[in-house]
Amino acid sequence: MLKTQKDKKLENNFSNNNKTKKKKNIIVGLSGGVDSSLSAALLVESGWDVEGLTLWLMKGQGSCCSEGLVDAAGLCEDLGINHKIIDSREIFEREVIKKTTEGYEKGFTPLPCSMCNKNVKFEEMLNYAINKKDFTHIATGHYARIKKSSYAETLDYKSFVFKDFLLLRGTDENKDQSYFLYSLSQEVLSRLVFPLGEMKKEETRKEALRLGLRTAQKPESQDLCLVEHYGSMQRFIDKHIEPKEGEIIHVNGKVLGTHNGIHHFTIGQRKGLGIAWPEPLYVKSLDRVKNIVYVADKSDLFNREAIISKVNWVSIEEPKQEIEVEAQIRYRSHPVKGTLIPMKNSDNPANTFKLIFEESQSSVTPGQAAVFYKGEILLGGGLIN
């Protein structure tokens, strides 16, 4: 029988990791959404021995019986596979809630999804698979892809030393989630499968309907899990950080008003400042020590360079000299050309680099991730200082 385009896409996704053809046992992370549901269903349809795994992340009333957990359990029953729930509330509290709170207190704008991926989600899944012993792979519903290093040999990227496994953007440019995965290790990539990596979002909905999945018509979540749980990021912040009054000052030195905590602001913010000025003003910087919010005209928001710390090199060995990259400094932003220069010396910790943009960029925000690409290959990424 001739293979359909869908079959070829799935084959591409399922054949990039070693030993895939010999051992077919896999743990699938299930959130109760359509993407993770379809990932599990496609793996079952393709002949894998699948077990669903859902992480119980949130503390509080009703969180143990959330809609996501119920849908994930029901899906596994429909597919005839086992479903396991792991209580990950303590590690999520420590690695995501606490660190996100600390980031806001320091005047940063943290990226909770990356924290969760690095220290909770994939670690918990991998440890569970390893402890089960007979499970060799893990899978999620992320829109991203993994290739072996031989893929890079077809490209003219001679300035890089590639690792065994490469992380790539998802085929669907509008849904690509590789930005949030820059902290993954080679150990994780060697066992990881992304069933949706070659698919478009509209295809996933059609496939879910074709397979009759109970989540096929479920609306797509647009928010962080923290936002879904607390109602808004503002409520999360108010619950975890005490108000502290300070001044809002124009970069020319004029005091324009007061605020109740720098944790309520982010670089480039315009709305909600509560100040009067003839022209629109934006948050330029946050001074944690003096508890000051500095504002300026939009033209003052541009920066030509940034310091990137805690860089993790996903697909290549750490460069010892400057390299040319395409840098993405926000999830929904387009990558921009830049030069990355190592800063390893007595004044800077290891894995710290200076990123010089080819053209100045607006609202380069401390706490967010700067992720480096070469074409569709994610090279690595770190935190904007």
From Swiss-Prot:
ATP binds at residues 29-36, 55, 141. This is tRNA-specific 2-thiouridylase MnmA. Keywords: ATP-binding, Cytoplasm, Disulfide bond, Nucleotide-binding, RNA-binding, Transferase, tRNA processing, tRNA-binding. Disulfide bonds join 116-225. GO terms for molecular function: ATP binding; tRNA binding; tRNA-uridine 2-sulfurtransferase activity. It is found in: Cytoplasm. The gene is mnmA. Residues 175-177, 330-331 are annotated as: Interaction with tRNA. One of its GO terms (biological process) is tRNA wobble position uridine thiolation. The record marks 142, 368 as: Interaction with tRNA. It catalyses: S-sulfanyl-L-cysteinyl-[protein] + uridine(34) in tRNA + AH2 + ATP = 2-thiouridine(34) in tRNA + L-cysteinyl-[protein] + A + AMP + diphosphate + H(+). GO terms for cellular component: cytoplasm. Its main location: cytoplasm. The active site is at residues 116, 225. Catalyzes the 2-thiolation of uridine at the wobble position (U34) of tRNA, leading to the formation of s(2)U34. CDD domains: MnmA_TRMU-like. NCBIfam families: PRK00143.1, trmU. Gene3D superfamilies: Adenine nucleotide alpha hydrolases-like domains, HUPs, Translation factors. Belongs to the MnmA/TRMU family. Its EC number is 2.8.1.13. The keyword Oxidoreductase does not apply. InterPro entries: MnmA-like (IPR004506), MnmA-like_C (IPR046885), MnmA-like_central (IPR046884), MnmA-like_central_sf (IPR023382), Rossmann-like_a/b/a_fold (IPR014729). PANTHER family: MITOCHONDRIAL TRNA-SPECIFIC 2-THIOURIDYLASE 1 (PTHR11933:SF5), TRNA 5-METHYLAMINOMETHYL-2-THIOURIDYLATE -METHYLTRANSFERASE (PTHR11933).
